[in-house]
């Protein structure tokens, strides 16, 4: 059974600023993946990249956009089985914003340690709980 990974974080930033951080390529490169060459928050837009020092090419496709509220993209690896989806949802909480990230389909990836659920969990905790927080609040 594939249990989705879920993480939530509240940022001391307005929802518009968080949305821009999630959808503007130049802003995304500062907290998400610096090697990202292009991105458009448009359903069907495909993008790919490889982490520095890795031979695992990530292939993503935007699957859902609700302006200012929700962004989702598929997450696959070139030449490897499995497909997952990442969904970012934003909620206004006064002058702050709560982000809810859900990553489904992790069990569909190979049993190779690179695809271990724990790697994804640790990665998202760093990206959402630290990288994005520091980017938005400093």
How should each PLM-predicted stretch be described?
Residues 1-38:
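Hydrophobic ligand-binding cavity/cleft-lining segments
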Residues 4, 16, 47-48, 57-61, ...:
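Charge-dense, helix-prone N-terminal extensions
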Residues 7, 11, 49-51, 90:
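Hydrophobic residues in beta-strands and at strand termini
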Residues 9, 101-103:
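Short, hydrophobic/aromatic-enriched beta-strand segments in well-ordered soluble domains
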Residues 18, 28, 47, 62, ...:
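Hydrophobic pocket/interface hotspot
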Residues 38, 53-96, 104-107:
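Hydrophobic-ligand binding "helix-grip"
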Residues 41-46:
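Short coil-to-beta transition motif at edge beta-strands of beta-rich domains
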Residues 105-138:
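A conserved amphipathic terminal alpha-helix motif
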């Amino acid at each position: 059974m594939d249990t989705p990974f879920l993480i939530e974080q509240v940022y001391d930033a307005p929802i518009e600023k968080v949305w821009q951080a999630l959808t503007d390529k130049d802003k995304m490169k500062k907290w998400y993946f610096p090697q990202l060459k292009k991105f458009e928050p448009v359903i069907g837009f495909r993008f790919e990249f490889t982490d520095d020092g890795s031979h695992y090419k990530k292939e993503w496709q935007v699957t859902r956009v609700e302006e200012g509220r929700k962004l989702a993209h598929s997450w696959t690896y070139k030449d490897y089985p499995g497909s997952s989806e990442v969904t970012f949802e934003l909620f206004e909480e006064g002058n702050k914003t709560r982000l809810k990230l859900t990553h489904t389909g992790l069990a569909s990836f190979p049993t190779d340690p690179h695809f271990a659920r724990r790697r994804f969990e640790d990665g998202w905790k760093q990206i959402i709980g630290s990288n994005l927080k520091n980017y938005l609040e400093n």
